[in-house]
Every structure is written in structure tokens, then in C-alpha cells.
Amino acid sequence: MPLNRELTASGARFLEESATAADYRLFLLPGAPAKPGLLRVDGDGAAIAVELWAMPADAFGRFVATVPPPLSIGTLTLADGRTVKGFLVEAAATAGARDISAFGGWRAFMAQAKASA
């Protein structure tokens, strides 16, 4: 998955799968390699599958510095009401990008794309 290598190199460890509150849209951002962009929206959102990771606090700043634009780290609201730090995308980067929210998450989208290839 995009940036998983950077997460593990920073000492992060996978905790669990979860989902966002139904306040987000997921986009396929242009360019290669394929990467997702998660955007919080006012209305017409969907719950999107996400992964939760734990990272040592001393590595967090270094990791954030490696996140390429138009991605950023912000606060996500999960379906169970928890708030966590996670990847978001700048709204301007979604102009003309394919909305893939109907797949429910990046892994599901990639599985469908692979099956269609």
C-alpha cells in the first residue's frame, strides 16, 4: 500500500482495520504510482475503510516531513467516534480526480482494478 514502507521504516506497527465516519470521499489521485486521497466533505460522504497504525512519537515529525503533497496528515473521525491522525488530501487535488468512494476503501478499489486488468 502507498507509504506502508515509510510507516514501517519509521517504526510504526499495524494496529487494526477500521472505517471513517460517513463524512469522507476517496479519490484516485492522478499520476503514478496509483495513490488514494481522502477528503472530508460536508454532506454526501461515505464511510471509508482505513488502517490504524501506532508510531513512536519521536519518529512522527520525521515521518510527516516525508509525506508528499497534495497529501497531508490531519485528524480523521472514525465510525466509532474516535479521532486519529491520518492521511488527508488537499481539496484542490481532487478536481478532475476519479471518485472511488463506492468501493469503500483503497484495498477494495485496488483488488477490483487488479481483477479487471
Features from the language model and the residues they span:
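Glycine-aromatic micro-motifs
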Residues: M1-A117
